[in-house]
Amino acid sequence: MNKWLFRANTSRFRIHDFIRDYGFVEYLQTKNVQEGDIIYLYITAPYKRVEYKMIVERANIPLREAIDDSSYSLKKQPSTFVDSDVFVRFKTIADRVENDELCYKKLLEHGFNYTMQSDRPVNDETAEYIDSFFK
């Protein structure tokens, strides 16, 4: 099992509403995530912190089976996908945490060694720190 930090942009998608309504979210699968991997969801500005702990419930979901989440999109142009695209489903496994101790600066202080420009693996030190906030 691997642990990952994925980003969610609230200026492009109503992530909090979607997770509240469905208990999961689907992403275009670009990383080698596998079922059972842990996902920490980092919410970008204005929050700038980890707010969700999730598990990969399903990977390699074909486009035809992916959920239509377009009503939650805030983008002016709809996303376009091709038939070969696959998606991954992250299911919540803990309640949302709204704590500024999970900001990027604090993650760096606890072993995270990356920028927030893309989704990244999480080492044990960082995972233990993040996990301490989730019950």
Describe each model-derived feature in a short phrase.
Residues 1-6, 22-28, 64-135:
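Contiguous surface segments at macromolecular interaction interfaces
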Residues 35-37, 50-52, 84-86:
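A generic structural signal for short beta-strands and their flanking turns/coil linkers
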Residues 5-21:
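Short, basic/aromatic beta-hairpin or loop at an interaction surface
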Residues 49-59:
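Short beta-strand-centered aromatic/proline hotspots
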Residues 10, 43, 60:
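Residues that form ligand- and interface-recognition hot spots within folded domains
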Residues 11-12, 27-30:
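Short, positively charged
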Residues 30-43:
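Short coil-to-beta transition motif at edge beta-strands of beta-rich domains
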Residues 43-49:
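Short, charged beta-turn/beta-strand-edge "cap" motif at the junction between a beta-strand
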